[in-house]
């Protein structure tokens, strides 16, 4: 049996709409992500387990893991009889790359089970395609970091889908999921069809400056440039208490904060453990909406998807 874990990810990172994403892992050692196991069988079967399994589609063919199996078999030109199990530990519509976790874990597990017939580039292209079935458009800012680890910049030129950019070891990512759902499709629909020239220029300056600051090892500058003029001004209205939370975490000492992916998860960057804990405590008390919400203090997950056991 092959068992693969795929970590949560925070896409956009305020400054890089659809072109930046970071894989994250809790500092306490908890696994924040999905697990898919594959073993040989007489015919295909899929079993759903985990905290959020009851949120999955009741029809198996609508489950993205089934679609991953189907697409993988098509790529190999044969039907591969396997028993698959999805441990759905990630909330759906959370802004933490939930669908990407399932897609990445499923495809890596199938590839491992079959002796790695597909290379990473081919796998990543397939992951983006399947993620697009859920979100409505092909984009790699969750699947790339989830699969490859670290902070990934989407390239999509010269046969390169994404490449890793250097992160900062001292950065702690406080992630607060309030327990409500925001669909990626809904969050995209709220965005304008056109942007003002000054916003386009500001976006380019922020993103170019952020990448420069990462490579020139200027963490304070990198954090200061994590500003969103593309999505956050429009999506903030979908997130109860978001504006107040951003102001509060800044006053506590967070270096930057914003919407993780399309929300509703809020991320806050800190460079001191005690600051991160105070931010986490405030968000636990004031940003969570129900019992399904949670807060994790994380670091970059540099490993990406990996075989367990």
Swiss-Prot record:
PROSITE patterns: GHMP_KINASES_ATP. The gene is thrB. This is Homoserine kinase. It comes from Salmonella arizonae (strain ATCC BAA-731 / CDC346-86 / RSK2980). GO terms for molecular function: ATP binding; homoserine kinase activity. It comes from the Bacteria. Keywords: Amino-acid biosynthesis, ATP-binding, Cytoplasm, Kinase, Nucleotide-binding, Threonine biosynthesis, Transferase. The keyword Protease does not apply. It holds the Pfam family GHMP_kinases_N. Its main location: cytoplasm. GO terms for cellular component: cytoplasm. It is an enzyme of class 2 (transferase). GO terms for biological process: threonine biosynthetic process. It catalyses: L-homoserine + ATP = O-phospho-L-homoserine + ADP + H(+). It is found in: Cytoplasm. Pathway: Amino-acid biosynthesis; L-threonine biosynthesis; L-threonine from L-aspartate: step 4/5. NCBIfam families: PRK01212.1-4, thrB.
């Amino acid at each position: 049996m092959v068992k693969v874990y795929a970590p949560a990810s925070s896409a956009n990172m305020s400054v890089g709409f659809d072109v930046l994403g970071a894989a994250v892992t809790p500092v306490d050692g908890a696994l924040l992500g999905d697990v898919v196991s594959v073993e040989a069988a007489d015919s295909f079967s899929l079993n759903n387990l985990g905290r959020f399994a009851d949120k999955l589609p009741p029809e198996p063919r609508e489950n993205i893991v089934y679609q991953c199996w189907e697409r993988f078999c098509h790529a190999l030109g044969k039907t591969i009889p396997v028993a698959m199990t999805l441990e759905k530990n990630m909330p759906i519509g959370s802004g933490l790359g939930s669908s990407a976790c399932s897609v990445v874990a499923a495809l890596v597990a199938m590839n491992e089970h079959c002796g790695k017939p597909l290379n990473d580039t081919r796998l990543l292209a397939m992951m983006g395609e399947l993620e697009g079935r859920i979100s409505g458009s092909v984009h790699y800012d969750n699947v790339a970091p989830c699969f490859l680890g670290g902070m990934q910049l989407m390239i999509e030129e010269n046969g390169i889908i994404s490449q890793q950019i250097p992160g900062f070891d001292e950065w702690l990512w406080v992630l607060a999921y309030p327990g409500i759902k925001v669909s990626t499709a809904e969050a995209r629909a709220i965005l304008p069809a056109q942007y003002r020239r000054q916003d386009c220029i500001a976006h380019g300056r922020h993103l170019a400056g952020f990448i420069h600051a990462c490579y020139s090892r200027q963490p304070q500058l990198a954090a200061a440039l994590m500003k969103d003029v593309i999505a956050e001004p429009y999506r903030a209205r979908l997130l109860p208490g978001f504006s107040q939370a951003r102001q509060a975490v800044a006053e506590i000492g967070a270096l930057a904060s914003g919407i993780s992916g399309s929300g509703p998860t809020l991320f806050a960057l800190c460079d001191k453990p005690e600051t991160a804990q105070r931010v986490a405590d405030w968000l636990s008390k004031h940003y969570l909406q129900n019992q399904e919400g949670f807060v994790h203090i994380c670091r970059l997950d540099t490993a990406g998807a990996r075989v367990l056991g």
